[in-house]
Design a protein with these regions (language model features):
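N-terminal helix-turn-helix DNA-binding core of bacterial DNA-binding proteins
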Residues: 27-66
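Canonical helix-turn-helix DNA-binding module
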Residues: 52-94
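Charged, amphipathic alpha-helical coiled-coil/dimerization segments
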Residues: 76-126
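Pre-recognition alpha-helix immediately N-terminal to the DNA-recognition helix
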Residues: 14, 21, 41-45, 105
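Terminal interaction helix/tail motif
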Residues: 15, 105-155
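Hydrophobic/basic alpha-helical segments enriched in Actinobacteria
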Residues: 11, 15-18, 32-35, 50-55, ...
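Mid-protein regulatory/catalytic core that forms ligand/cofactor-binding pockets
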Residues: 140-192
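N-terminal leader segment of winged-helix/HTH proteins
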Residues: 1-33
């Protein structure tokens, strides 16, 4: 990523302002629902995260928030019946978070869906997504954060390792993965 000291091109600056404006429009749409923007983004993350990444700590890392802020956000989502805590069957000391059917219903009317439809209508889907992902990865790396990404794009992902419902494998976590798992975002993702 380019240094803050060197001026960006007018095109790059225009793109950054457009991304910022889109973010503001999404947050305004969130306010029109029963959720504040932090709650909406947390719900979106939990719906897109794999089973290993649906934890309060991973959510805090993804949002760039403190654990305390995320705790309050989760309490609000639980009170609204959109998220529930589940004991980790492998490690009783930790919990996993799950989006409830009501939460999934809420997401079916998510303002992000309208934005995705506009992007698709403009014919900019795949190229735009790739460019934005590269920009996001560079910005996150510059700030020392974790990128989060889909399992199937990770260097630890092993495709078609066994027959059955869980054909793929995560070499980092030594876990079998389903086809659906492969499309979800992971806190441990490392670009291939």
């Amino acid at each position: 990523m380019r240094s803050i000291d060197s001026p960006p091109s007018p095109t790059a600056l225009r793109a950054a302002h457009l991304v910022e404006r889109l973010g503001r429009l999404l947050r305004a749409g969130d306010h029109a629902t029963a959720l504040n923007p932090a709650q909406a983004e947390a719900l979106r993350y939990l719906a897109r995260a794999n089973r290993f990444s649906r934890t309060p700590a991973s959510l805090a890392d993804y949002l760039g928030s403190t654990r305390g802020t995320v705790s309050q956000t989760l309490l609000a989502l639980e009170a609204k019946g959109l998220v529930e805590r589940q004991a980790n069957v492998r490690d009783g000391r930790s919990i996993h978070l799950a989006v409830t059917p009501a939460g999934m219903g809420f997401l079916s009317a998510d303002p992000v869906r309208a934005l995705a439809a506009a992007i698709e209508a403009a014919g900019a889907g795949a190229c735009l997504a790739d460019d934005l992902e590269a920009s996001l990865r560079a910005a996150v790396a510059e700030r020392g954060g974790r990128a989060f990404g889909a399992c199937h794009t990770c260097r630890h992902f092993r495709r078609d390792q066994r027959p059955g419902a869980f054909p793929h494998h995560c070499a980092l976590l030594d876990e079998a993965l389903s086809e659906a798992d492969a499309t979800l975002i992971c806190a441990e993702q490392a670009a291939a």
